[in-house]
Every structure is written in structure tokens, then in C-alpha cells.
Design a protein with these regions (language model features):
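The conserved cystathionine-beta-synthase
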Residues: 13-31, 78-95, 102
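Tandem CBS (Bateman) regulatory domains
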Residues: 1-10, 48-77, 81-92, 112-141
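Short hydrophobic/aromatic-rich motifs at helix boundaries and adjacent loops
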Residues: 6, 22-26, 38-40, 58-61
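A glycine-centered beta-loop-beta connector
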Residues: 27-30, 35-51, 91, 99-114
Length: 141
């Protein structure tokens, strides 16, 4: 099964000038945990609900802080040509729950572990990816 059959298209995005408050409100209204950051349609980063809490609050950022100060720019992506199984393998390998799908640098969709889990072709792969992602980190000493 091709990834385009399970990915979400027409993904809501923000840009680098968006504030933490804007992003948090968009996440809440859309009931999502990640917002892609794009400039002219090109994916330049992601911001997650965890980024807002861990990076934002820990660094005393407020709702007006631009998200450019806390986005993840080293983004693992997939392509529209990959299979659901390949996407699950990438997500498992990199321990990520969401995979942006790009074409020529442009964001064309987003796939989550939930998307993979509901596709009959990938229940096993989604379960494996979730298992790999859920391995607890070793405590720092």
C-alpha cells in the first residue's frame, strides 16, 4: 500500500513568524500534536506540543515568542513514492510518531502512527514502530 493512501493531505501549517500562542491554539483547535513550519510551501521544520512545553516553558518563553526559537529543523521526511511499510520502518528507526511527506521540498502530507495503525496492510509495522518508539530512555546520571 502506498503512503499517499493513508496520509493526511492539505496539512495546516504555520510559518517562522508565528507565535507560540498561535501554534498552541491551532494545535488545540485541530486536535493535533504537531504543526509543520513552512515558508512558501517548503517544509523548514516542525513544532510539537512537547517542544512548546519542554523548550518553551523551560526557557521562560511566553505566548508571544516566535516559534523560530524552538522548532525542530532536522526533520526526517518521507516521499509519496514510499510504501506504508517503508514509512513505518523509517518511523521506527528514528523513533518518531509523525512523518511529513514531501515532494521537491514541498510539504504534501503528513502520516502518523495512527494512520498506519488503521491501514490493514501495516498493523504489524505500526505496532513495531510504536514498540520501538516507546522504549524508555536511559536515565542520565
Amino acid at each position: 500500500m502506498n503512503i499517499t493512501e493513508v496520509m493526511t493531505s492539505n496539512v495546516e501549517t504555520c510559518n517562522l513568524k508565528s507565535s507560540c500562542g498561535e501554534v498552541a491554539n491551532k494545535m488545540k483547535s485541530l486536535d493535533v500534536g504537531v504543526i509543520p513550519i513552512c515558508e512558501d510551501g517548503k517544509l523548514i521544520g516542525l513544532i510539537t506540543d512537547r517542544d512548546l512545553v519542554v523548550n518553551g516553558l523551560a526557557n521562560n518563553f511566553n505566548a508571544n515568542t516566535q516559534i523560530s526559537e524552538m522548532i525542530t529543523t532536522d526533520v526526517i521526511t518521507g516521499t509519496k513514492h514510499m510504501s506504508v511499510e517503508q514509512a513505518a520502518d523509517i518511523m521506527s528507526q528514528h523513533q518518531i510518531r509523525r512523518l511529513p511527506i514531501v515532494e521537491d521540498g514541498q510539504l504534501i502530507g503528513m502520516v502518523s502512527l495512527g494512520d498506519l495503525a488503521v491501514s490493514n496492510a501495516s498493523n504489524k509495522e505500526a505496532g513495531k514502530a510504536l514498540e520501538d518508539i516507546s522504549v524508555p530512555a536511559e536515565p542520565t546520571k
